[in-house]
Amino acid sequence: MELTLWTYEGPPHIGAMRIATSMKKLHYVLHAPQGDTYADLLFTMIERRGSRPPVTYTTFQARDLGGDTAELVKGHIKEAVDRFKPEALLVGESCTAELIQDQPGSLAKGMGFDIPIVSLELPAYSKKENWGGSETFYQIVRSLLKDHSRESKQSWQEEKRRPRVNLLGPTLLGFRCRDDVLEIQKLLGQYGIDVNVVAPLGASPADILRIPNADVNVCLYPEIAESTCIWLERNLNIPFTTTVPLGVGATQDFLKELHKVLEMEIPQSVNESNNSKLTWYSNSVDSNYLTGKRVFIFGDGTHALAAARIANEELGFKVVGLGTYSREMARKVRPAAKALGLEALITNDYLEVEDAIKETSPELVLGTQMERHSAKRLGIPCAVISTPMHVQDVPARYSPQMGWEGANVIFDDWVHPLMMGLEEHLIGMFKHDFEFVDGHQSHLGHLGGKGTQNTTKEAIKTNLQDSVITDGDPIWTHEGEKELSKIPFFVRGKVRRNTENYARQAGCREINEETLYDAKAHYKA
């Protein structure tokens, strides 16, 4: 166990809560102390839902530990069933309650209810949130479909109907899942493919029973749905797709794979380059500015892998770092990083990720909410591509990541920080020209240039002071800092570190303009 300020994933019962809250007519009884009820805020504050999660907490206290906590659990289970009348009941325990070993799932099954009861055994001290969500979804599907017949059914061609697919994996607190589902439904409809069930998002236990009516399962989020898709293929003979449609190339590959599995002819429109604005821009002269930009990528496995492909193949970026916090996806991320000449960063320590960002000196960071803060401290543009996220990454507007429109959104989210960074750098370069003299009139009208000079100096001073000066460190002179401020902000930190290292090696106590250029010549030699 380690003490940390931030964590990429919560304990596995948070993953179970995500599944329960995503579904309808389902209730989750969680054996947990009062302090574990904080999880409600994740859905009401970040996801901005208008209702509480369908979760009943036993909320035991210290004084209850001296009595029969099993009776406390049974009382809450009965109250939840009588009050909410769910079609199925999930029963589990939090990391704290796991230590008591009351086994609430076994207690619930012995109470004689006539609804399916899914007992969740989630090892809180060895697994995390995404695994908990995956295991919960798997147990729900397995429990409800375990008695389903394995007899082969007629194909969609024999039944003379349109092909049907299930979209599996989207959940609440997933990255743009709501909009991804709408985009993929729209995309499949254009090719004559119907959606049978979307699960767990918006599905009820009755919908889970309809999963076998589909011809193919589409695994949209492997972290949540892959184990379920594998079980459905083995036990119910329902094949599933493995390509996640994130980006133009991946969307094309996804459609080709799906058509092949369904034994449909692949239409020529799949390969048309005008499906997304990203392709048009990548072929335009304006995109030359972006070619070769250094990008660092970190997030959940699905989005990190997709981002690496988009950056490398579709936007012409140079990927200088690739990693994930999801150990379940590490097996897929490592070969992808190796193909780019990198060593994958597999860690759940955000400070280790920040150190890797410093070391690689990227011009753009694609990561989570944590990397946004790290990039801000380092003065590097950043776009959030993965959970964990904050409320600003759950837009009220339609903003998918998958499909053609998702590629457009990705293009905007990634390119705009770089373009605004260019504008900031140009202003920094030419701020001494007569058009930028502080006394001149500005767009602020009567305020003119008052206060601009001090603000600019403070901003430069803040950007420059990104390391703590110790007794052995060389000191920057005013001329040296002034010259350093002319260097683009996205490489300024690297130049500063290299110059300081050179000054230490050369025995310089002060870094002036001449030292800066000597260091430049030294590292270029």
Swiss-Prot record:
**Gene3D superfamilies attached here?**
1.20.89.20, Nitrogenase molybdenum iron protein domain (3.40.50.1980), Proto-chlorophyllide reductase 57 kD subunit B (1.10.8.550)
InterPro entries hit by this protein: ChlB/BchB/BchZ, LI-POR_suB-like_C, Nase/OxRdtase_comp1, P-CP_red_C, Protochl_reductB, Protochlorophyllide_Rdtase
> Which Pfam family would be a valid example here?
Oxidored_nitro
The main enzyme category here is oxidoreductase
Heme as UniProt keyword: no
Provide the cofactor list for this protein. [4Fe-4S] cluster
Which keywords annotate this record? Answer: 4Fe-4S, ATP-binding, Chlorophyll biosynthesis, Iron, Iron-sulfur, Metal-binding, Nucleotide-binding, Oxidoreductase, Photosynthesis
E.C. designation(s) = 1.3.7.7
Annotated residues for binding of [4Fe-4S] cluster: 36
Q: Does the keyword Cytoplasm apply?
A: no
Oligomer status and interactors: Protochlorophyllide reductase is composed of three subunits; ChlL, ChlN and ChlB. Forms a heterotetramer of two ChlB and two ChlN subunits.
Sum up the protein's function in the record's words: Component of the dark-operative protochlorophyllide reductase (DPOR) that uses Mg-ATP and reduced ferredoxin to reduce ring D of protochlorophyllide (Pchlide) to form chlorophyllide a (Chlide). This reaction is light-independent. The NB-protein (ChlN-ChlB) is the catalytic component of the complex.
The entry sums up its family as follows: Belongs to the ChlB/BchB/BchZ family.
Q: What is this protein called?
A: Light-independent protochlorophyllide reductase subunit B
The gene designation is chlB
